[in-house]
Structures are given as C-alpha cells and as structure tokens.
C-alpha cells in the first residue's frame, strides 16, 4: 500500500445514517424506542429465567446468555448513534472506536456461538429424547457457554490488536454509524494485508463453520421428525424448534445478505441498512420471537405475575 501523509488521529467522524435533517427527530424517536424495547425485552427474558425454577434447563441457560448478548450487542452501537444524531459533530475518540470494534465483535460472535449450542440442544432433545438429560448435563452446558465466551474473547482481541497496529492518515471520516472494521481498513495508511488475511480465515472459522453446524443439526432434526408417525407429534417437534429457527434465519439472513451478496449500486446505503437490521432490529425481535412462540416463557410470566398479584392482595 502506498504510504500517505501520516498524522496522529485522535478521533473519527461518523457520517451516520443517510437521513434528511428535517427527519432527524422522527428517526431519533424511532431508534430510541427500538433500543429501549430491546433492553426491556431482553431484560425480561433474563429475569424470568433467573426467577422461575421451571426454566432452569439447558435451553434456557443458552437463551439467557443469548438475551444478555443481544442486549449488549445493541448497546455497543445504539447509544453512540443516538448521541451523534443530536450532535453537530458526530465524532468518536480513537480509543472509543477500538473499544467499539472489540465489543461489537465480542457480542456478535457470542450470539453466533450460542445459536450453535442451542441448535445442538434441540438436536439432542429431538433425536435422543430418552438420553437428553444424561447428554445435556449441567457440566456440558456450562462448558459450552464458557467455551463460547473464551472463543469470542480471543477473536475480538485478535482483530482489535491488529487494528491498533495500523496507522491512519488525515482522512478520518467513516461512512457508517459505528466503527465498522472494513471502513477503518480503507482509511489506514499502513499495510492492511495481514488484517485482511486474518479476517478471511477467521470469518471462515467463526461464521461459516457455526452456520454449517446449525444446518447439519437441522438436517438431522428434520430427518428424525419425518419418521414420527403422528401429525401431532410432527407439529410438537417442529414447534420446539420454531423460535430458534426463526432467530437463526433472522441473524444469518442479514449477515449473508450483507457480506455474501455484495451490491455495486448504493453499496454504502445497503451496508448501513443491513447493519441496522442485525444491530438494532434482530436484538429487538428476539425476545418477542421467544415469548410469543414459547409456552414455557409465557407460563413463567403468568406464574410470576400471579404470585406478585397474590402478594399484593395479602
């Protein structure tokens, strides 16, 4: 890469969203309400799982961690976006940009690995129902969660350290609403080939491989379900996977649309819209998907609210 005039970059300017100035207040209110819904919805899921002993099972251990991951993932970008929408100079410090990259990768990958663990849980529940409790032991479940946290820590730290070694020039404008790693690489003055090679290798391991494992799990699940003689049994088996499959489709659908189906026309606008989908919309919808399609969650809400109502009456 040709070296340009280097200078010390203390902050980056985030161009944000392509919203006309006269519509800024409307979109600010919209994004604020979406963020608050995300926080409240995921907090409710976490609290329900903690308080209701009926939900102290492997599936809900993974779900509580996924809700925490979604809550934090949205919190990495949304507060800064909302702040910059009200600011005349939408900037972010250099250190803040690196921190945002780290936590964005960390919580994004954590949700990815937890979806794999949940797919394995559904696979065992449907394909080996008689051995479910012995296979999905507390030790294995905790190990899967800890492994997810360890792997995501390594991945996020690796990319953040590689990004920190780069030099940046006078151009400090990021055409995005957060510190997107690919946008930062385009601003770098120093050689980015190492970063690009590592991104290619790690994406293959941390995105494609988990997706392949989920697909393999569902191939086995569908194969087992089709062997069930009664239509009621088939419906019950599919209903246990419905929520997870919806979340998987939502998460990987936006990621595949963004990274594997590039568009030359309006690529910046497309990237921004797709990024909003998986940073704002998906974390907001996940609690609704699990609460509306899950009898256990709805039952836990009824038990806790009824118990609270009885206590108030006494």
From Swiss-Prot:
Glycans are attached at residues 5, 265-266. Odorant receptor. Activated by a lily-derived aldehyde as well as other odorants. May signal through an inositol 1,4,5-trisphosphate (IP3) second messenger system. It is a multi-pass membrane protein. Residues 1-29, 82-97, 165-196, 262-271 are extracellular. It is found in: Cell membrane. SUPFAM superfamilies: Family A G protein-coupled receptor-like. GO terms for cellular component: plasma membrane. Keywords: Cell membrane, Disulfide bond, G-protein coupled receptor, Glycoprotein, Membrane, Olfaction, Receptor, Sensory transduction, Transducer, Transmembrane, Transmembrane helix. The gene is Olfr1. Residues 51-59, 119-143, 218-240, 293-314 are cytoplasmic. It comes from the Eukaryota. Disulfide bonds join 97-179. The keyword Aminoacyl-tRNA synthetase does not apply. It holds the Pfam family 7tm_4. This is Olfactory receptor 1. Its main location: membrane. The chain crosses the membrane at residues 30-50, 60-81, 98-118, 144-164, 197-217, 241-261, 272-292. InterPro entries: GPCR_Rhodpsn, GPCR_Rhodpsn_7TM, Olfact_rcpt.
């Amino acid at each position: 890469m040709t070296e340009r005039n280097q200078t010390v970059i203390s902050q980056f300017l985030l161009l944000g969203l392509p919203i006309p100035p006269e519509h800024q207040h409307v979109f600010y209110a919209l994004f604020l309400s979406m963020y608050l819904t995300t926080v409240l919805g995921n907090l409710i899921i976490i609290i329900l799982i903690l308080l209701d002993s009926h939900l102290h099972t492997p599936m809900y251990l993974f779900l509580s961690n996924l809700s925490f991951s979604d809550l934090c993932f949205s919190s990495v970008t949304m507060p800064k976006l909302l702040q910059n929408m009200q600011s005349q100079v939408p900037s972010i410090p250099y250190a803040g940009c690196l921190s945002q990259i780290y936590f964005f990768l960390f919580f994004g990958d954590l949700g990815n690995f937890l979806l794999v663990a949940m797919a394995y849980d559904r696979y065992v529940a449907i394909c080996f129902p008689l051995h479910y409790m012995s296979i999905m032991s507390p030790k294995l479940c905790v190990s899967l969660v800890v492994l997810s946290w360890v792997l995501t820590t390594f991945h996020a730290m690796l990319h953040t350290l590689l990004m920190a070694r780069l030099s940046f020039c006078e151009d400090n404008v990021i055409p995005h609403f957060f510190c997107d790693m690919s946008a930062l690489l385009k601003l770098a003055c120093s050689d980015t080939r190492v970063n690009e090679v590592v991104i290619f290798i790690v994406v293959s391991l941390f995105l494609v491989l988990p997706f392949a494992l989920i697909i393999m799990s569902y191939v086995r699940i569908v194969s087992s379900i089709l062997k069930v003689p009664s239509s009621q049994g088939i419906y019950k088996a599919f209903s246990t996977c419905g929520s997870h499959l919806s979340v998987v489709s939502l998460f990987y659908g936006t990621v595949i649309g963004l990274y594997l189906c590039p568009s030359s026309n309006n690529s910046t606008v497309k990237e921004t819209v797709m990024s909003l989908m998986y940073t704002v919309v998906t974390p907001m919808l996940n609690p609704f998907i699990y609460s509306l399609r899950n009898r256990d969650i709805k039952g836990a809400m009824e038990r806790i609210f009824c118990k609270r109502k009885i206590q108030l009456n006494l």
